[in-house]
Regions:
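Histidine/acidic residue-rich metal-binding segments in metalloenzymes
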Residues: 11-186, 202
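Gly/Ser/Thr-rich active-site loops/lids in small-molecule metabolic enzymes
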Residues: 93, 205-221
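Short acidic-hydrophobic catalytic motif
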Residues: 189
Length: 237
């Protein structure tokens, strides 16, 4: 779990060294949602965390893309679960990942990319790592084991999360990234809304459905059974 930046001002920046010193070295920011930081704010917290010996973790999706496509799909197909992934395409993640990496390079700061879901985003990470930039990337079991075909199921709402499930090609790329070390963390992004909550809040539009799935209790068993036992990962990896 991370503390989250929802705005940046002098008072927030001044408290970063204290927070890190108290044992909370990683803090999180978003490039989408109402509490997102703009590029200037991201640069400020990247630099402040660098100086304090901390690390910024970033949820990477382009807010303008999600808003533009979401508004369109809310009018055209509000109850189709596929409207969710269509409102957050792969380029939405890749643009934000690329931008965060450029900002981190400018600030001369390390950065942590959370819940990577696309081959396009992974390509950006690999390019930065190859150039010597200190970048840590994570993905999650849901992006390794499920794809967007799940949204066609009867209760496709239960798979709504952000970023959304992707293609089979993206899944394969993420396994490769985890195996070769480009992705060094498999986390959960645990967010356990019930199916009943999703049905209720998403009944008028799937774009109002709360996003997230549980995963804390299944992460290790899934990585072992689907990764190690299927030859995708070595046990030491």
């Amino acid at each position: 779990m991370h503390g989250v930046f929802q705005h940046v001002d002098d008072a927030v920046l001044a408290r970063i060294p204290e927070v890190v010193a108290q044992g909370f070295p990683t803090l999180k920011a978003y490039t989408t949602y109402d509490g997102r930081l703009d590029d200037e704010g991201l640069l400020q917290v990247l630099a402040a965390l660098r100086d304090a010996g901390g690390l910024l973790a970033v949820h990477c999706e382009n807010h303008a893309i999600t808003r533009f496509l979401g508004d369109k799909l809310r009018r055209e197909a509000p109850r189709d679960p596929m409207s969710h992934p269509r409102s957050r395409p792969a380029r939405c993640e890749a643009e934000a990942v690329n931008r965060i990496l450029k900002l981190a390079k400018t600030a001369e700061a390390p950065v942590y990319i959370v819940h990577l879901s696309t081959a396009e985003g992974l390509a950006c990470v690999r390019e930065a790592q190859k150039a010597g930039q200190p970048v840590i990337a994570e993905t999650c079991p849901q992006y390794l084991l499920l794809d967007e075909s799940a949204y066609a199921e009867r209760d496709g709402l239960k798979y709504i999360m952000a970023p959304p499930l992707r293609t089979e090609a993206d899944r394969a790329a993420l396994w490769e990234g985890l195996a070769d070390g480009s992705i060094s963390v498999a986390a959960t992004d645990h967010c356990s809304f019930s199916l009943a909550q999703k049905r209720e809040r998403g009944k008028e539009s799937v774009l109002d459905c709360p996003g997230g799935v549980p995963g804390v209790e299944t992460r290790i068993p899934l990585l072992f059974s689907e990764g190690v036992l299927h030859g995708r990962l070595t046990l030491p990896r």
